[in-house]
Amino acid sequence: MKKIDVKILDSRIGNEFPLPAYATSGSAGLDLRALIEEGFDLQPGETKLIPTGLSIYIADPNLAAVILPRSGLGHKHGIVLGNLVGLIDSDYQGPLMVSMWNRGEQPFRIEVGDRIAQLVFVPVVQAEFNIVTDFTQTERGEGGFGHSGKQ
C-alpha cells in the first residue's frame, strides 16, 4: 500500500468522524465527508463548494487522485459533482474541496459529516507528442461517437 501525506484541516476528523479508510479489501475509493459548520439544503440547480477537512500531497508524479461522485447520491437524488470529476495532481497541496451540484428537482439536505464523494488514486503516464502527418491505419479509423454500435 502506497503512503500518501495527509493534513487534517478540521479537528473533527479523528474525533467525531473517522479518517477516510477503505470499506473493504476490494474498495477502490475512500469516502470524503462534508466538513461544514452546519447542515444546509442544496437547492435544485445549485452548486456549492464543500470542504472535506483534508489536504493531501501525493508527491509521486506517477500518481494522481480523482474525486468522484457517490453512485447512490447521483442515481437516487440527482446529486453529482459540479465539475463531474475532480483531478488532484501529485504536486497539489491545498485543501480537498468537493463541488456539489443538485441536478434534481427537489432540495437535498447535506448534514455535517455526510459522505459526499470518494477519492480514488490512479496511475499517471505523462506523454510526449510525436508530430506525424499520417497515422497507421486501423479498422476503426476516424469513427467516433456511436461508431462501434449499441451491441
From Swiss-Prot:
Pathway given in the UniProt record: Pyrimidine metabolism; dUMP biosynthesis; dUMP from dCTP (dUTP route): step 2/2
KW Transcription (keyword) present: no
Lineage, opening ranks: Bacteria, Pseudomonadati, Pseudomonadota, Gammaproteobacteria, Pasteurellales
SUPFAM superfamilies: dUTPase-like
Disulphide-bonded residues: none
Enzymatic reactions: dUTP + H2O = dUMP + diphosphate + H(+)
Primary role: This enzyme is involved in nucleotide metabolism: it produces dUMP, the immediate precursor of thymidine nucleotides and it decreases the intracellular concentration of dUTP so that uracil cannot be incorporated into DNA.
Keyword Hydrolase: yes
Cited Pfam families: dUTPase (PF00692)
Binding residue positions for substrate: 70-72, 83, 87-89, 97
EC number: 3.6.1.23
Alphabetically ordered keywords of this record: Hydrolase, Magnesium, Metal-binding, Nucleotide metabolism
Organism superkingdom: Bacteria
NCBIfam families membership: dut, PRK00601.1
Top EC class of this enzyme: hydrolase
Any single biological process term in GO: dUMP biosynthetic process
The protein's name in its UniProt record: Deoxyuridine 5'-triphosphate nucleotidohydrolase
Protein family according to the UniProt entry: Belongs to the dUTPase family.
GO molecular function list: dUTP diphosphatase activity; magnesium ion binding
Names of required cofactors: Mg(2+)
